[in-house]
Amino acid sequence: MINIFDMMGPVMVGPSSSHTAGAARIGNMGRTLLGEEVARADIGLYGSFAETGYGHGTDRALLAGLLGMKPDDLRIPNAYEEANRAGMAYSFRTVELCDAHPNTALLELTGKSGKQLTLQASSIGGGAIVVNKIDGIDVNFTGDFNTLIVRNQDESGSVAAITSILSQVHINVANMSVNRHRRGGDALMVIETDQHIKPRQVEFLSELPGILSVTYYDKEDDEDGAGFDEGNL
């Protein structure tokens, strides 16, 4: 359901909610999912992001988000200078994508430790975004919920183990999807929750058998959530 704040648009540094606010959120999402400071960002622009994005500040907004800035950060117009100051290398190019939204960015990120992440996401209007792919695996989430991204071995029991533990600590699953490249390979669980998930909960989940990594995206206006009741584990 659309509310009055969706119609008014986000608080942001302009000029465009799609090309600027949404782009900043995409960059910020990439930084969060990488899990560390970005050392290098190779950024592909598709559709109107490529055609008119530079005039609307899409490039600066993406860089700003990758530096951890929110859409209303007054430093966004100076994002190139901020990136250079932070020692973050970057490049931009036009890309062709199949069946993608016109306002789509492809981020190929390398962190300070050498960790790598590829993220494809679209800005769909009013500052809202949709994440389409992570490391080439199809996903579909918006960042409007607290979100767990779980990379696991594609074997029976992995999904049940995660959801069982979330249930034990009274964390309600709002939406969930599981995608994979192929049977028996790596898979991605995307779990959107109503409650906040604490760092020690994320760490506990990451240590379960068959779980390769767990990344947590905390929505901006998150509320305090339930803690692990260790007596139940």
Regions found by a protein language model. Name each.
Residues F92-V95, L119-L233:
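A conserved regulatory-domain signal marking ACT and ACT-like small-molecule sensing domains
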Residues T52-R60, P102, A187-E192:
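Short glycine/threonine-rich loop-to-helix capping motif typified by GTGT followed
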Residues V13, M29-A39, L67-P71, R85-A89, ...:
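Generic secondary-structure signature for well-ordered alpha-helical cores
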Residues L67-L117:
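Contiguous domain-boundary segments centered on the initiation and propagation of an alpha-helix
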Residues I26, G68-P71, I76-N78, R85-G87, ...:
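Protein-protein interaction/assembly regions in multi-subunit complexes
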Residues D42, Y46-R85:
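A structural-propensity feature for long, helix-poor, extended segments
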Residues M1-V11, A41-G44:
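Short, hydrophobic/aliphatic alpha-helical segments
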Residues G9-G27:
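Conserved phosphate/anionic-ligand binding catalytic regions in large, soluble enzymes, centered on
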